[in-house]
Amino acid sequence: MFKVGEKYKIYKNITAELKEKKWVKAVAEHIPEHERFVRFRLHFTNMYGENSSYVESYTMSELTEMMKSGELVRA
């Protein structure tokens, strides 16, 4: 289903205070052998206009729900 190096877009909350959602570029970075979760590196531009990234992991059930709702798409 997911492969290391594949690019995706995730629609997620950027600022918790404003409940603002934006599309964030994501690359599948690591998938363990048991395949229960996928670790993504998320790339975005911060409020100062600088490019930044961080790592976030999602379980397979979370990713399935995100795909069904349209919050996760292939780039």
What are these regions (language model features)?
Residues M1-E17:
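Short coil-to-beta transition motif at edge beta-strands of beta-rich domains
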Residues F2, I31-H34:
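A short, structured loop/turn motif at beta-sheet edges
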Residues K3, W23-A26, F37, Y54, ...:
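Detector for intrinsically disordered, low-structure N-terminal pre-sequences
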Residues E6, E17, K21, R36, ...:
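Intrinsic-disorder/low-complexity loop/linker signature
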Residues Y11, E29, R41-T45:
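A structural detector for beta-sheet-dominated domains
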Residues A16-P32:
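Short beta-strand-centered aromatic/proline hotspots
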Residues E35-R41:
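Short aromatic-glycine-enriched beta-strand elements
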Residues F44-A75:
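Intrinsically disordered, low-complexity, charged/polar segments
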